[in-house]
Amino acid sequence: AIFEEGAFAEGTGTASRIDIIPTYKQDILSRFKLARPVKVVLDGGNGAGGEICADILTKLGATVIPMFCEPDGDFPNHHPDPVVEANMQALMARVKEEKADLGIGLDGDADRLGIVDPDGRLLFGDEVLSLYARELLTRKPGSTVIADVKCSSRLFNDIKAHGGTPMMWTTGHSIIKAKMQEVGAPLAGEMSGHMFFADNWYGFDDAIYGSARFVALFSAQDKPMTEL
């Protein structure tokens, strides 16, 4: 074998280091504007995305109250699963304490999110997807919106009621993304908090982008979260 014989290729090459974070932030910021001020409590779950997300939301114009946004792989505050109520207790309490418009929780690698309303209630994943879908369908009526099999019939009925075409599909982020490409769906989501955006984004699940998008769509409403 090459390793055992030490028969490695020889030569010289180059390596470069590029910081993509400023470009990533600017890409998201260029896509949204807040219609009015929004107060957000952000629970980063001590994962990879908290600090970046807090900075983006602040630059977008939101008032951001950060919690557990420093990366720490020991996850000292709670397990970073933002769709489990037991993990979101501190966020739920802080939203009420601060009288915030909403709370956002991120998972460890920032591809899933949870949303908390001003009463401190953690929304189900299909409720979050329905709010993204309603906004999308005002711009792109008739669009296909994909949801995994764990989502309730309430979501599928809501998509229909707002002029969309709901599609139920198998759970799994790679499976959902493939189906989105196959049928040209601009939006998809799972009960687990994975939200996939091919409309005004690149077709994958990104909770930092999803946070900015949610805050922007909420800012365009004249109702509190509890009435949406």
Where do the PLM segments sit?
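Predominant activation on well-ordered alpha-helical scaffold segments within soluble catalytic domains
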Residues: 26-29, 54, 58, 68, ...
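Gly/Ser/Thr-enriched, mixed-charge loops and adjacent short helices
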Residues: 1-98
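Conserved active-site and cofactor/substrate-binding residues in soluble primary-metabolism enzymes
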Residues: 19-23, 48-52, 86, 90, ...
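Short, charged, surface-exposed secondary-structure boundary motifs
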Residues: 74-79, 134-136, 176-181
